[in-house]
Amino acid sequence: MIQEESRVKVADNSGAKEVGIIRNLGGSVKKTSNIGDIVVCSIKKALPTGLVKEGQVVRAVVVRTKYGIKRKDGTHIKFDDNAVVILKEDGTPRATRVFGPVARELRDKGYLKIVSLAPEVL
């Protein structure tokens, strides 16, 4: 679970390395975001030649959390870090590659392009 003011890694090649969470979308009193949720972020660290620049405000989808999730079959899945993938205005990923594993729940939430770009789906 990721809350506001958290700093998380970026798991794509958009040029951003770290973002700060500004707002969790999906409700007026929503405190935390889990895998597959949309967040509003500010770019905190970025490469100078990347698609995004430091200080830019973007939307992103959460692809990994340390907190983990419980599946209906009773299994738990946790990752080593918190990570997001930056999105365009139409909801597709801005980058052309996704680094690291992503959760299978992204497929259920309609992020098929991110799942197809990822090297591993858990």
Swiss-Prot record:
Matching SMART domains: Ribosomal_L14
Keyword Metal-binding carried by entry: no
PANTHER family: 50S/60S RIBOSOMAL PROTEIN L14/L23 (PTHR11761), LARGE RIBOSOMAL SUBUNIT PROTEIN UL14M (PTHR11761:SF3)
Subunit structure of this chain's protein: Part of the 50S ribosomal subunit. Forms a cluster with proteins L3 and L19. In the 70S ribosome, L14 and L19 interact and together make contacts with the 16S rRNA in bridges B5 and B8.
GO BP term (any one): translation
Protein function: Binds to 23S rRNA. Forms part of two intersubunit bridges in the 70S ribosome.
Keywords of this entry: Ribonucleoprotein, Ribosomal protein, RNA-binding, rRNA-binding
GO cellular component: cytosolic large ribosomal subunit
Cysteine pairs bridged by disulfides in the record: none
Statement: the UniProt record of this protein carries the keyword Membrane: no
Domain of life: Bacteria
Family listed: Belongs to the universal ribosomal protein uL14 family.
Protein name per UniProt: Large ribosomal subunit protein uL14
InterPro entries: Ribosomal_uL14 (IPR000218), Ribosomal_uL14_bac-type (IPR005745), Ribosomal_uL14_CS (IPR019972), Ribosomal_uL14_sf (IPR036853)
GO molecular function: large ribosomal subunit rRNA binding; structural constituent of ribosome
